[in-house]
């Protein structure tokens, strides 16, 4: 069975692409998975990063190092391809959430129970799913289209999720300090990424700094 069709057929709650479509689109899905894994490697390589793990040191952590992160990245690469396929099929958010929970299990198995990439499973996974929507529609993967696909396809579900009482440390800290949580960022279409970080990166590139 074709690779992309096999992956999508193994996941519930959505219609798999046809075999012909899956055969055409599989290289694009794999390219998204490679880009996601490369982004995680680049983040790990970035130094200095006060408090955070890099190849230079472990920051403020005594339970993880760069090797822990690399094991996690290798374990998560298939997840980013799987969630891209879910995006191609415009799967409901519940299917994305199930896929992310399974990815978290793989991460914890690879790291011995250490949370290295829970945030990246959520945020980067959503971006891959949005990329899948655009791939399925034959659209280019530019930033504005990526953000719009995320909001159009899963914005309502993300808003509902963001309204839940937080149970994870990051969400509870955000609520206590009056900050915008990761879930709320996602529900708003990742404004910090698209309105602040990306323009800063593009300006740095134009200035020859990146």
Regions found by a protein language model. Give the residues of each.
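Phosphate-rich cofactor/ligand-interacting catalytic cores and adjacent structured alpha/beta frameworks
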Residues: 2-89, 93, 131-210
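Long, hydrophobic/aromatic-enriched structural stretches that serve as scaffold segments
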Residues: 78-133
């Amino acid at each position: 069975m074709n690779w992309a069709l096999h992956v999508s057929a193994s996941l519930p709650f959505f219609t798999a692409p046809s075999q012909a479509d899956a055969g055409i689109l599989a290289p694009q899905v794999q390219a998204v998975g490679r880009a996601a894994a490369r982004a995680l490697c680049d983040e790990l390589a970035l130094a200095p990063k006060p408090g955070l793990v890099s190849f230079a040191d472990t920051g403020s952590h005594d339970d993880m190092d760069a090797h822990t992160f690399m094991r996690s990245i290798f374990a998560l690469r298939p997840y980013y391809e799987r969630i891209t396929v879910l995006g191609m099929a415009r799967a409901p958010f519940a299917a994305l959430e199930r896929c992310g929970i399974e990815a978290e299990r793989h991460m914890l198995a690879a790291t011995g129970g250490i949370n290295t990439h829970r945030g990246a499973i959520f945020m980067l996974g959503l971006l891959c799913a949005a990329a899948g929507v655009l791939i399925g529609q034959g659209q280019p993967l530019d930033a504005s289209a990526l953000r719009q696909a995320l909001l159009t396809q899963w914005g309502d579900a993300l808003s509902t999720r963001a309204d839940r009482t937080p149970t994870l440390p990051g969400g509870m800290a955000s609520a206590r300090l009056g900050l915008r949580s990761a879930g709320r960022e996602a529900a708003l279409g990742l404004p910090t990424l698209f309105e602040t970080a990306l323009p800063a990166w593009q300006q740095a590139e134009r200035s020859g700094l990146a």
